Amino acid sequence: MLLSLKAATVRFGGRAVLDAVDLDVAEHETVCVLGPSGSGKSTLLRAVAGLQPLDEGQVVLGGRAMDSVPPHKRGVGLMFQDHQLFPQRDVGGNVAFGLRMHGASRSEQEGRVRELLDLVGLPGAARRAVASLSGGEQQRVALARALAPRPRLLMLDEPLGQLDRSLRERLVVELRELFTELGTTVLAVTHDQGEAFALADRVVVMRAGRIAQSGTPLEVWRQPADEFVARFLGFDNVVGATVAGEAADTPWGKVPVPEGSPQGPGTLLVRPAGVRLADATEGLRCTVAARTFRGTHVAVHLQPEDDAPRLEAACALRDAPEPGETVGVAFDVADIVVLGGASGA
């Protein structure tokens, strides 16, 4: 492993903001740490960089404990959310900053700056003023600066957080391709699920200073570990349930569950795609409370007639019923997950 955190703990005022975290990052792997504000993800990044001392535990990088190694000698690159470019230096001066700190010659600096600006899509921009750059261009310059000294680990703190949505979506694809091409090992933190799932080989979801779940994007999306992870990923159709065989008793009535699901009391997730609309005479009777256009589909918000928790269904625009209509609901077992942990619903 290139990076290992072993029982890493950080306390602020007696409260553990990083609580005995164990995490490994393999060479050439991109890991995104995902979580709400206050979950400990940025503290984790700062601890690896050496900017935040651990109260307990250890950071091991390249097989060496980092206990007494200062930040500038850890061989890591760090890119902050606000980019922190030097306004008094031009683009080339910003990109070359780390190279100068490492004693590179002028010719080495110039060659590396040209190489990286080409790589991040800004050829010939070395003499441009930082003030003339767009937000996306500033992000590219900050990335080039972080990559310039060839860090063994690149760390990104909300790398696309200040950019508009369309630019974020485009750049996250470019970042993924760039890291794959360079073989860069990346540890990134973000609160944006879409960004993490598009960028990462592995997603780590944090809650209250601990790791709630770790897995590939597909694993985490298909099988959230518990109600917290499911709701954080944006799933709202989550209720307490009692599973017996291949069905569960829920506030929505009997709901089918996948074969092999954990039995007894638990928590049930129904993805919106698994809420199938039918004639009002069939299944669970609901009233359409609202519709929300989501681009690729319409989210239909349903209120069951017996005051059970609301449901969200995903429908094609041409099939979406109007608010006020009464519909029936059936459930598709392919989009149902029995979650771990007790229900908070």
Swiss-Prot record:
Quote the catalytic activity from the record: Fe(3+)(out) + ATP + H2O = Fe(3+)(in) + ADP + phosphate + H(+)
Example GO molecular function term?
ABC-type ferric iron transporter activity
Iron recorded as keyword? yes
Query: Could you tell me which residue ranges the ABC transporter domain spans?
Result: 3-233
Give any Gene Ontology cellular component: ATP-binding cassette (ABC) transporter complex
Write down the InterPro entries for this protein, in alphabetical order.
Answer: AAA+_ATPase, ABC_SmlMolc_Importer, ABC_transporter-like_ATP-bd, ABC_transporter-like_CS, Mo/tungstate-bd_C_term_dom, P-loop_NTPase, Transp-assoc_OB_typ2
EC code(s) of this entry: 7.2.2.7
- Membrane-spanning segments: none
Annotated ATP binding sites: 35-42
Q: What does the function comment of this entry state?
A: Part of the ABC transporter complex FbpABC involved in Fe(3+) ions import. Responsible for energy coupling to the transport system.
Q: Which family does it belong to?
A: Belongs to the ABC transporter superfamily. Fe(3+) ion importer (TC 3.A.1.10) family.
Q: Self-association or partners: how does it assemble?
A: The complex is composed of two ATP-binding proteins (FbpC), two transmembrane proteins (FbpB) and a solute-binding protein (FbpA).
* Protein name per UniProt: Fe(3+) ions import ATP-binding protein FbpC
The encoding gene: fbpC
